[in-house]
């Protein structure tokens, strides 16, 4: 498996989006819409979009942005999704670890919001802690390397 920082949406994003929508998730639709309109391209300082490839197939995607709900050195994980057929193979964990490694260069903490039990359990396994906040469900403090 290979994790790459990407600066354009690969054509395979449409297949990943279709799988996400079938699973009840619309955030990849929002990712493609915001990317195409230029509203959010993960190109501000400290931001990035990463893709996970397995046998040259896009199997996961995730972004890191500046957290718009804070005014300090806080990043936000956004649009993290792994294709159902690739779950349980450490794709999500490796993708999140790559995003957090990038975050360590720019942020002191990273927050995210998930409203699913599966997502919450996944992020807890990745080292995040639950928080009570109107705009975030989990946080992790970054240790500088």
Where do the language-model regions lie?
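Conserved GNAT acetyl-CoA-binding A-motif
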Residues: 103-115
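A short helix-loop-beta-strand connector motif used in the catalytic cores of GNAT acetyltransferases and
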Residues: 39-51, 76
């Amino acid at each position: 498996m290979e994790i790459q920082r990407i600066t354009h949406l690969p054509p395979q994003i449409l297949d990943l989006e279709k799988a996400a929508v079938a699973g009840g998730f619309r955030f990849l639709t929002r990712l493609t819409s915001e990317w195409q309109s230029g509203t959010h391209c993960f190109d501000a300082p400290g931001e990035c979009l990463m893709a996970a490839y397995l046998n040259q197939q896009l199997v996961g995607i995730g972004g890191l942005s500046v957290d718009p709900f804070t005014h300090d050195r806080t990043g936000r994980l956004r649009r993290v999704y792994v294709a159902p057929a690739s779950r349980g193979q450490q794709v999500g964990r490796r993708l999140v670890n790559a995003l957090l490694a990038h975050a360590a260069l720019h942020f002191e903490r990273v927050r995210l919001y998930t409203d699913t039990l599966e997502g919450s359990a996944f992020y807890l396994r990745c080292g995040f802690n639950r928080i009570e906040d109107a705009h975030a469900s989990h946080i992790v403090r970054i240790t500088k390397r």
